[in-house]
């Protein structure tokens, strides 16, 4: 019983952190909308200021997302480390699948951030999911 209570308390702490992450995602959505307006203005006016602001916003957005993606990948990895020899094959498989998915999302975040930094012409479309 004490083990399950500890596990429940740990899960509740994770949920609290995830709730903060949802708030950050709302901010990311607002920033993305604003970045799109800067991109649109650049396309219509060829304003270098709008272009630079768009690039800076995209770098900021993907930097924050990368931190979030890292959190989830690390959390999934920690779940693997907590597996016990008696855990079911299904539990083991699902924990590894969760880690692989989280790790691939982290890799995509790294790639998108690199694109945002390197793409001076802003002609490569990138988006977070």
Where are these regions (language model features)?
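Glycine-rich, hydrophobic membrane-spanning regions of integral membrane proteins that mediate transport
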Residues: 1-129
